[in-house]
């Protein structure tokens, strides 16, 4: 099952998370050339902070700032964890 947070609005992102056999990050961004590595770093550091692995993270970015990406990811992960409690 997939869990998501965010939107396709300008300056936002849609993050979708699901369980996986390995940690995999897929990023689609209008600013990928300039900020693709930074977006990936924000996602990886957030997963590391939360000690999470084996997830598929899909990020459709429309120019979101780092704190927006992080908060959307945390919200999607929270929705997923609530389902399994």
Describe each region flagged by the PLM.
Residues 1-85:
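N-terminal intrinsically disordered, cationic/polar leader segments
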